[in-house]
Amino acid sequence: MPTIQQLIRKPREPKRVRSKSQHLESCPQKRGVCTRVYTTTPKKPNSAMRKVAKVRLTNGFEVISYIPGEKHNLQEHSVVLIRGGRVKDLPGVRYHILRGVLDTQGVKDRRQRRSKYGAKRPK
């Protein structure tokens, strides 16, 4: 335990808070190109085939991001926009792909929470 004199000479340094989405480099979204689109299975109590894509960002980082909603049109070399936000039951997936932006189509026949899935207003 330091003495008061030592604390006056060199005060305590606050712990630095690390960002949970570091590869975005403090940007709200980042553009990238899909290098691989595949499905993966979630952690223990859950069971599904979750759609994910490996994306090379414009800053050179490669990240795994989740494709939300039913059905998608993504394939290799698709240009996508990603945002932060992890998927709790997929280890290593810390980003989401934005639907209805760039090469990603919105979810078809979506009626509720449309803005989250890039769906147009139904007629």
From Swiss-Prot:
Region entry Disordered, spans: 1-28
Coiled coil: none
Amino-acid biosynthesis in keyword set: no
MF term (GO), any: rRNA binding
Taxonomic superkingdom: Bacteria
GO BP, one annotated term: translation
Cited Pfam families: Ribosom_S12_S23
GO CC annotation terms, alphabetical: small ribosomal subunit
Keyword Ribonucleoprotein: yes
Sorted UniProt keywords: Methylation, Ribonucleoprotein, Ribosomal protein, RNA-binding, rRNA-binding, tRNA-binding
Record-listed 3-methylthioaspartic acid modification sites: 89
Gene3D superfamilies: Nucleic acid-binding proteins
Subunit-level organization: Part of the 30S ribosomal subunit. Contacts proteins S8 and S17. May interact with IF1 in the 30S initiation complex.
NCBIfam families: rpsL_bact
HAMAP family, A to Z: Ribosomal_uS12_B
Stated family: Belongs to the universal ribosomal protein uS12 family.
General function of this protein: With S4 and S5 plays an important role in translational accuracy.
Protein's name according to its UniProt entry: Small ribosomal subunit protein uS12
